[in-house]
């Protein structure tokens, strides 16, 4: 039976909690973080360290996962677009673009 691998952009507290919850559901996780000492490193099945704009690291991450989410809104929009062209990103990158600007976010809501 196919079990998708969940990619998580960001390895802070929320990324760690997401990896812990996924493990309880027998879902493998890979965390991509721009911090080598990210706490998510200790809760995921695999870990990719690199700048969120490093295309080689982005490709390494994409190769390891089936579907991607992110733990916070400060992932560069362009990075999410690049990833979304290869693998599905949820929430969609256009939502991230809205929440990166609090005035746009208020208008959207």
Question: At which residue positions do the language-model features occur?
Answer:
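ATP-binding N-terminal substructure of ATP-dependent carboxylate-amine bond-forming enzymes
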Residues: 1-107
